[in-house]
A protein has these predicted regions:
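Extracytoplasmic/periplasmic domains immediately adjacent to an N-terminal transmembrane anchor
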Residues: 1-164, 369
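Junction motif at the cytosolic side of a transmembrane helix
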Residues: 2-4, 45-46, 268, 272, ...
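Short hydrophobic, aromatic-rich alpha-helical segments embedded in or entering the lipid bilayer
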Residues: 9, 68, 300-340
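Transmembrane helix boundary and interhelical loop/hinge segments in multi-pass membrane proteins
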Residues: 18, 98, 183-205
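Transmembrane helix segments
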Residues: 38-49, 276-313
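Short helix-capping/hinge motifs at transmembrane helix termini and TM-loop junctions
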Residues: 39-46, 187, 191-192, 238-243, ...
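Long, hydrophobic alpha-helical segments
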Residues: 166-188
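Alpha-helical transmembrane segments and their short interhelical loops
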Residues: 209, 213-283, 288, 336-343, ...
Length: 369
């Protein structure tokens, strides 16, 4: 009972410290939100249409029909193209400046030759490959309507479990807030104890310093769960995030052992490095790197081969690989092997806490304190 009282006392003290030292909460709030904003803005969270120019020099009925086919082409989200220029001179200028994905020209002899001219700024980028595929799709639809296509195909571009890119980024930002918050808050609180000499007082308490570590774990997990509601709410309100109560509750309950493991890692790093200026950049880089290469930015199966190989050995990638599908209702449960790993992550967190405080006490004794 006394040990539980000690853990709760440390937790209450930690909450007061975080209330006064608000800079400790800046990183787990700002880093996921900044990444979420950048991903949504840069990688098409606002829609699917690419800026292109189209010029019709034929002015024939056939060319007008093809023009309309380009303008009417669309995905299940937005139109394929955003036609921002129809003047030939301006289109060439903007294309050479890299302000257009594509310049489509219907020449004067279009009716006779049935040729169109396509000019791109960078033919090798993934965006250019995507926009050329859209052109082919549009031309196939046009030819099918004209009865000139001998083989037709039906493209299924939407699946029942599809989500908006912005919604996927929103879910990833929730998971990033959870594991980054748990790790960095634990490290910050340990560094605070070290820099303010509180660790010596804790060592002399009847329950021992390890109870302080458990109190920090409790605070880190609790606060990270609360902070994650910020990106979750923003995603629901603005990013087309579909909220599934059961799935979200399952994720929040199941991820607690992972958060304990992350808090244990934070305490271990705090015991080793001790100072904010070393701890914070290191943990932030771990979080951002995991987000990009571990399934937060895109599914691991969509990454390049080298990235997939790194993700296979980078243990933190399971946070996004396993929890994102449940969060978006792609899956409704975790497998037995996943549950076993999640449980072991919690055990590892407690083990690292023992090691961290054992290491701290040993250094204090040999340091003459």
């Amino acid at each position: 009972m006394k040990k539980w009282q000690a853990i709760l006392a440390v937790h209450n003290r930690n909450m007061k410290i975080l209330t006064r030292q608000k800079q400790m909460l800046i990183q787990p709030i700002i880093v996921p939100l900044v990444l979420l904003f950048l991903m949504v803005v840069v990688f098409g969270g606002g829609g699917d249409d690419w800026p292109v120019a189209i010029v019709n020099e034929s002015n024939s009925l056939e060319s007008q029909e093809l023009m309309e086919a380009f303008k009417d082409s669309e995905s299940n989200i937005t139109p394929y193209f955003d036609f921002i220029e129809m003047n030939s001179y301006e289109a060439k200028k903007k294309g050479s400046e890299g302000r257009l994905h594509l310049f489509i020209k219907l020449p004067a002899d279009f009716v006779e030759n049935k040729n169109i001219e396509l000019k791109t700024y960078n033919i090798n980028s993934d965006a250019m490959k995507n926009v050329r595929l859209r052109v082919e799709h549009t031309l196939n639809d046009y030819m099918e309507k004209q009865g000139a296509l001998k083989v037709t195909s039906q493209q299924v571009t939407a699946q029942p479990n599809d989500v908006w890119r912005s919604a996927f980024y929103g879910g990833s930002s929730v998971l990033l807030t959870l594991f980054l918050g748990s790790m960095i808050i634990a490290a910050n609180l340990h560094a605070f104890d070290y820099e303010n000499r509180t660790i010596k007082e804790i060592t002399l308490t009847p329950t021992g310093s390890i109870m302080a570590g458990f109190g920090i774990i409790l605070t880190s997990v609790f606060v990270s769960l609360i902070l994650s509601l910020i990106p979750l709410t923003l995603s629901i309100l603005f990013l087309h995030f579909d909220f599934y109560f059961y799935n979200t509750l399952l994720v929040y309950l199941s991820i607690v052992p992972i958060l304990i493991g992350c808090a244990g890692i934070g305490l271990f790093l705090g015991a080793y490095f001790k100072q904010y200026r070393v701890l914070q950049p290191l943990i932030i880089l771990i979080g951002i790197g995991t987000y990009i290469i571990g399934g937060g930015f895109a599914g691991v199966n969509m990454l390049m081969p080298l990235a997939r190989e790194i993700a296979d050995i980078w243990v933190f990638s399971v946070i996004f690989e396993w929890f994102n599908p449940v969060l978006h209702n792609f899956a409704t449960s975790f497998s037995f092997s996943q549950c076993t790993f999640i449980f072991l992550a919690g055990v590892l967190g407690f083990l690292l806490t023992f090691i961290a405080y054992r290491f701290q006490i040993r250094k204090s004794i040999f340091g003459g304190q």
